[in-house]
Amino acid sequence: MKKDLLTENEVIDAVVKYFNTKGRTEVKKVVYRADASQKEHGVDLQIKLANAKGNGNKYFIEAKGNKRADGTAMRSTFNTNFRWAISQIILRIKVDSTKNNYIYGIAIPDSEIERAKNLIRDNWALKTLKIRLYGARHTENGDLEAIEYLPSDIYN
C-alpha cells in the first residue's frame, strides 16, 4: 500500500465523512471537531449517532496525521504519535463506556493501520475498552474516505 500523507485535519475530515454515511440513524451530529492548526486541547472529534428519540452512541475520537497542519514532515515517528494518541484517548475515558453507549477510537492514516494493529493487537486493556481504529485515506479521485476497524478486526 502506498503511504498516504495526511494532516490531522484531513484525517478528521475523512472520519466525519465516514460517520455522515454510517448506518441508518436519523441524527448524525458532530458535537465537537478540533482544528489541529489551532492547537486546540481535548478530544479531536465527538460525534453523536441517534434515533429519533435521541437514543444512540457517542463517539470520542483522537486523530493523528502523518504530516503537520502546515504540510511539512512530522518530527516524531508514527509509533511515538500513535502511543501519544492512545494515552490521550485513555485519559479522556471518564465513564464505563458499556453503560453509557460511549465508543472510543483513534483515527490515523490508513497506510499506518497495520503498524497500529501490530502495536495494540495483544493489549488486554485496549481490547477490554474496545478501542476502535479509523483509517483515513485518499480515494483514486482524490476524495477523503475512512474505514472503521472494529475490535474484532484488531485484537487477538
Predicted segments — roles?
Residues 21-29, 67, 150-155:
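Short N-terminal signal/transit or membrane-insertion segments
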Residues 102-156:
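Domain-level recognition of nuclease-like catalytic cores that cleave nucleotide substrates
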